[in-house]
Amino acid sequence: MKALFLDIDGVIQSPSDQNRFKHVEEFVDLSKRLTKELNNGFDYYKFGGDYYDGNFRSASATQYDIAAVYYDWRPVVVERLRHILDTTGAKIVLSSDWREKGLHNMRGLLDIHGLGKYLYPYAPFCVPYGKFFEDAYNLKQRCEMQSDTMKIHQMIDKKMHELYPGDPNKWFDGYDPRTGEIREFLDRHTEIDAYVALDDRNLSRGLEGHFVSVYPFIEDEQVSQAIEILSHQDGPYPLPDVLKTDELEEWRKKWVYESKLY
């Protein structure tokens, strides 16, 4: 399987595109219309909520998410991403912080531009948005999960820093923690035999030969680079032995192996 690890902000969501703020009064009607027109089983109205009192600050974060995808993702950029996926047969693996909204919700958002069908049903480990706020027990479980995961990420980051030191004389040349998230995911998903990561963060240390730097959005040159990288099926991609610790395996047994998300 070919995987495209997708960041969103700075890749398909340009920081200069803020058109959603011109349409705040339309958010509720937009979510109702999308639910009806797309008819994909996702309730945008329920996801976004219906509260708005005329003050832009009262609109929910999820209403802004829907509007950002609808108003601010440039069609030409979406088509560049689609061209990579159609040409290579790759699936989207969300590496963006947006994945914390939950994969079900992200599929709904991607569907606004017809991209939901490309989404792989797993993502690098994160705590699903909203899942553990239902009662005191689940809130406690969420806190435990976050604590355990932070310790594992710190262990991975420390060893990855040692394995992939950056040039201290260059800006932003060091190892980025997102690289560790992707590498841990690849280690478990041996079905992936080709991958590329599109990101506005520097993921070159640890993803050598599989990273395309993007900012503020995907350009034609980066489309060609991504397609070329995905043409080389050189996987699977195991973690370095030094990272395969008992602590990592215990964390996976506790939080990952029984999950349907990771």
Question: Which stretches of residues belong to each language-model region?
Answer:
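C-terminal cap/substrate-recognition subdomain and adjoining C-terminal extension
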Residues: N105-Y262
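Non-catalytic pre-domain segments flanking phosphatase-related domains
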Residues: M1-I8, S16-N19, L248, K254-Y262
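Alpha-helical substrate-recognition element adjacent to the catalytic core
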Residues: A3-Y137, C143
